[in-house]
Amino acid sequence: MFSLKLFVVFLAVCICVSQAVSYTDCTESGQNYCLCVGGNLCGGGKHCEMDGSGNKCVDGEGTPKPKSQTEGDFEEIPDEDILN
């Protein structure tokens, strides 16, 4: 019974690992997918471009990294304006 549980756990881990998308360092040609959030992994003056098919290193501006929200990002609305 223990070995059956161990086998099921092992099988689940294998399935999860096989479904993962692997990202590598971007090549100079920009063919490899890359991670844009949390750091710019594109070398050689290239920038990361995010789209539906995957992130690629490209020449030019690329897509800006998402900005985290902080307290100063939003203008406070006075209570009087909300209640009226």
Curated annotation (Swiss-Prot):
Residue ranges of the region described as Disordered: 59-84
Entry's localization field: Secreted
Annotated Acidic residues bias: 72-84
Region (Interaction with fibrinogen-binding exosite of thrombin): 73-84
One Pfam family from the record: Hirudin
S-S pairs: C26-C34, C36-C48, C42-C57
Record region (Interaction with thrombin active site): 21-23
GO molecular function: serine-type endopeptidase inhibitor activity
Gene Ontology cellular component list: extracellular region
Gene3D superfamilies: Thrombin Inhibitor (Hirudin), subunit I (2.70.10.10)
Highest taxon of source: Eukaryota
This protein's UniProt keywords: Disulfide bond, Glycoprotein, Protease inhibitor, Secreted, Serine protease inhibitor, Signal
Regions of compositional bias (Basic and acidic residues) in chain numbering: 59-70
Glycosylation sites: T63
Main localization category: secreted
Signal peptide stretch: 1-20
Family the UniProt entry places it in: Belongs to the protease inhibitor I14 (hirudin) family.
Function recorded in the entry: Hirudin is a potent thrombin-specific protease inhibitor. It forms a stable non-covalent complex with alpha-thrombin, thereby abolishing its ability to cleave fibrinogen.
Protein's recorded name: Hirudin-HM1
Organism: Hirudinaria manillensis (Asian medical leech)
